[in-house]
Amino acid sequence: MHGYRTYNMESHHAHHDASPVDQKPLVVDLLATQYGKPQTPPPSPNECLSSPDNSLNGSRGSEIPADPSVRRYRTAFTRDQLGRLEKEFYKENYVSRPRRCELAAQLNLPESTIKVWFQNRRMKDKRQRIAVAWPYAAVYSDPAFAASILQAAANSVGMPYPPYAPAAAAAAAAAAAVATNPMMATGMPPMGMPQMPTMQMPGHSGHAGHPSPYGQYRYTPYHIPARPAPPHPAGPHMHHPHMMGSSATGSSYSAGAAGLLGALPSATCYTGLGVGVPKTQTPPLDLQSSSSPHSSTLSLSPVGSDHAKVFDRSPVAQSAPSVPAPAPLTTTSPLPAPGLLMPSAKRPASDMSPPPTTTVIAEPKPKLFKPYKTEA
């Protein structure tokens, strides 16, 4: 056998008078201790009495394993034991040795096990406290880390803004295009101009497309200057369509432009034509109704009679050389237009409106649109 050695009595062959019992060989077990079954020592000598599971291992309780790396089994606590230990922990985190002995006697647990449980419970409590207060502790201890946290928070808050940025940019681009290139605005009154109010109105009218309150603060800067800005393109918008189309189309374009822009200069210009009320919406309706008699009297003019600002454009078809000089002046005074008596008769109604604003706006515009007058 591998782990056994047989010893025979040397005197067996020498002394033949030995008893038959001496003739039997003696077998000694020389198996190393590390090959034996690992024995789990109790944490304390009282373990054998406290735990019923170890009652069968009572004989092995006094044995100590030769290998110190052998790990003992994990202690299983009952609900009653855990509840009692938790109550004691809430009363006092650090328990003295006499108190641990009392708990060991009450819970039928070894004193060393109770000591280890309190150590683990204190570490668990420490981890919980750190997990709850880690942002504040890190912010106060490390300024760089605090700056990174603030930057991340700012980036997360800025997320709602990008969807509104394209709309604001489009509104600004449309306003810039109309202001810089009035020629483009002639064909865009019904199409291009309404886009600017729709993008800028959510902040005030509260369209369903932009319910977020961020739209108000983002679009307000673009919406406020949009109202005073129309006076500059207002001249081309009111003049261009009438030069391009007939009297009926001119009146419809004027109604659309006045309704979309809602600028005061447009209302004041209409008052000089016989409209007493300086409202932004009512003049186009009155002018359309009153345009029929004027257009009948001035059948040769390509411009609707509702626009007396272009008074020199109606005679332009009849006499071309007289147009360039009196065109800007006719907006305020009806004297240069000998064929049109309507503005001169209804001039007292336009005294209340400020004429200098219309004169400054109308001066450069007719020069730009002379080709339209010649085509008409």
Swiss-Prot record:
One GO biological-process annotation of the entry reads: positive regulation of transcription by RNA polymerase II
Tell me which domain of life the UniProt entry assigns to the organism this sequence originates from: Eukaryota
Q: Where in the cell is it found?
A: Nucleus
Residue ranges under compositional bias (Polar residues)?
A: 47-60
Provide ranges: composition bias, Low complexity.
Answer: 283-302, 314-334
Pfam families for this protein: Homeodomain
Function in brief: May play a role in determining neuronal identity. May be directly involved in specifying identity of individual neurons. Pair-rule protein required for segmentation; involved in transforming the broad, spatial, aperiodic expression patterns of the gap genes into a system of precise periodic expression patterns of the pair-rule and segmentary polarity genes.
PANTHER family, sorted: SEGMENTATION PROTEIN EVEN-SKIPPED
Protein family membership: Belongs to the even-skipped homeobox family.
The name on file for this protein is: Segmentation protein even-skipped
Provide the organism lineage as a comma list. Eukaryota, Metazoa, Ecdysozoa, Arthropoda, Hexapoda
Designated gene of the protein: eve
